[in-house]
Structures are given as structure tokens and as C-alpha cells.
Amino acid sequence: MPIATPEVYNEMLDRAKEGGFAFPAINCTSSETINAALKGFAEAESDGIIQFSTGGAEFGSGLAVKNKVKGAVALAAFAHEAAKSYGINVALHTDHCQKEVLDEYVRPLLAISQERVDRGELPLFQSHMWDGSAVPIDENLEIAQELLAKAKAANIILEVEIGVVGGEEDGVEAKAGANLYTSPEDFEKTIDAIGTGEKGRYLLAATFGNVHGVYKPGNVKLRPEVLLEGQQVARKKLGLADDALPFDFVFHGGSGSEKEKIEEALTYGVIKMNVDTDTQYAFTRPIVSHMFENYNGVLKIDGEVGNKKAYDPRSYMKKAEQSMSERIIESCQDLKSVGKTTSK
């Protein structure tokens, strides 16, 4: 299927909310990782989201260029073409973008999509993330207002983060002592500033103890009930029913999370979950095994010539793609999206 249109993306998110499941959002940095994501989604018969961080996009542009926008555009172009060969729907998203790089990433990408829409074409991306967790909440939401208006005009969904996700993402680190739990006051301020959809649809990355990176199970202290508290704040403020889920939540920093906590978060309106650390490991592990198992072949030692079949990048990149795709299927299972593609 072609990359999801804005209408299809909205339908995907609506179905996830109604069905109590979420889509894995897989961070990709190359054609190989994009292929792995598409393969995993297709084998799980799950729609999904492919996303590029600022660092991933810069990497995608090549060492000689190192340009976030050029890398994101190039990776998106590959994904648009590659997705046509698969029978599932996939949306393209850009991950964490902090204030200091907005002008180098999200703002120019929004402008590119607006130009496409003005020509009668579809936007290049279906959603973008603004990460204002490092600035005061009022400034965070003021910038969110600006970006949401631009996103709405280009038929794009905005993702907004309130609160701080611990750990490190693309070199940006949040200390454990930071505010890792979004407060009821911040939920209320969010509604006051950007509404609940009438000013443009947005996804909300509220924090409930999430931590980026790799941690042993049990070392991530999640409190999904924070998300329930956010929904309760919105219900009361908007006069909605007790079972309403007005916020579309995103789960960040889920590596090492207990399965039960993930399932609980789904009941509170999580419809997107970022997956990066686990798929990075899944991609790298078989490459390491290949190098150890073919040590004398991948290296030219003591005057020997090695084995071309062993050091041909295709020999180990195929294994990496397969392993990563299998880990993505596991994420689809965890998030209950298996077999629920809207393309059926």
C-alpha cells in the first residue's frame, strides 16, 4: 500500500482508540531498517508508524552531508516507494525535536509538506513531534500552538510532549530527578492552549515514569494511572462521560517495561508506542554473531585474503533485517495490533 493518506492515518488512530490497541512506532535510520519495519508490520498484519529522529535523519543524509532535513526527505522518499510492495498501511513521523533544532528540522519539513499540499499533493509526513519537555510548560504550549496551526494547514498531526522522559535520546539526556510524571495542572493547561482536536489533531506524549534507553525489567517505575488522571481531568473540564478518552496518548521510553504496565496504558488511551532501543539491539545482535562466527573470513589476517562471502555487507545485513523484523512482530503482539490492519 502507498504511505497512508491523512484520512487513512486518522482512521488508523481512531480504530486503535476504539479497539484498545496501539501502533508500534519504529525508529529507522536507513533503507535496511525501513525494510525491516515494513517486513515486520506485514508479517504481523499490522499497520504501523515509521519514524526518524533528528539524529537518525542526519545519519540518513550521509557523513558528508549531515543535514537533518535532507536525510528525512531521502528516507521518506525511500519509504514511500518501498511501502507500495506491502499490504499494510504505514504512516511516516518525525521523532523528538527540541526547541534548538526546530528551525533545522520540523519547521522546514512542515513547509515542504505545505508546498506539496498547495500543489494538490499529499504531505510528505503524516505527523511530526515537537518535544518541549526541556522548556517551561507555558513556552512549550505556546510553541505547540504555532506548530499545530501549521500542521493542521498541511493535513498533518502534531505530537506534543508534556513532562520529561528520563534517560537519553539522541544525545539529549534527562536526569532521573526531573519531573517524570505529568501533573493534572499540565493536562489542564494543554487543553486550554491547544484544545482537544478542534484546533487540529494532536498526539500527547504525557510522562508517567518513562525512561529512554535500556533497563532491566522492573527498573522502570511506570505509573500508567497518570494517564488515567489526565483523561479524568479532560472529562471533567469538557463535561464528557466517565468512559471517554479525549486524549490520544503516546508511550515513550518503553524498553524494559513490564508487559502488564503496557497493557494497562492501552486501556487509558495509548494508541502509539515508540520502539527504538529494543530494535537497535535486535538489528545489531546477529551482526555481532556473524563477525564472531566468521572471524577469519571477515578479516584479512596473517597475509590471508579473508572470505568475500563473509564480509559482503549483504551477508550480515540480511540477518539484521530479519532479526529486527521479528522484534517488531513482538511489539505488535505486545500492543495488540496483530491482524488489525485497516487495509483488510
Curated annotation (Swiss-Prot):
Q: Which GO terms describe its molecular function?
A: fructose-bisphosphate aldolase activity; zinc ion binding
Record-listed E.C. numbers: 4.1.2.13
For this protein, the record's Pfam families field holds:
F_bP_aldolase
- Give the protein's cofactors: Zn(2+)
List the pathway annotation. Answer: Carbohydrate degradation; glycolysis; D-glyceraldehyde 3-phosphate and glycerone phosphate from D-glucose: step 4/4
Its UniProt entry gives the catalysed reaction(s) as: beta-D-fructose 1,6-bisphosphate = D-glyceraldehyde 3-phosphate + dihydroxyacetone phosphate
Q: Tell me how the cofactor is bound.
A: Binds 2 Zn(2+) ions per subunit. One is catalytic and the other provides a structural contribution.
Top-level lineage group: Bacteria
Which SUPFAM superfamilies does UniProt cross-reference here? Answer: Aldolase (SSF51569)
What residues does D-glyceraldehyde 3-phosphate bind to? Answer: 53
Q: Where does Zn(2+) 1 bind?
A: 96, 212, 252
Q: Please provide one cellular component term from the Gene Ontology annotations of this protein.
A: cytosol
Binding-site residues for dihydroxyacetone phosphate, renumbered to this chain: 213, 253-255, 274-277
Q: What does this protein do?
A: Catalyzes the aldol condensation of dihydroxyacetone phosphate (DHAP or glycerone-phosphate) with glyceraldehyde 3-phosphate (G3P) to form fructose 1,6-bisphosphate (FBP) in gluconeogenesis and the reverse reaction in glycolysis.
UniProt record similarity statement: Belongs to the class II fructose-bisphosphate aldolase family.
What's the name of the protein? Fructose-bisphosphate aldolase
Origin organism of this chain? Answer: Corynebacterium glutamicum (strain ATCC 13032 / DSM 20300 / JCM 1318 / BCRC 11384 / CCUG 27702 / LMG 3730 / NBRC 12168 / NCIMB 10025 / NRRL B-2784 / 534)
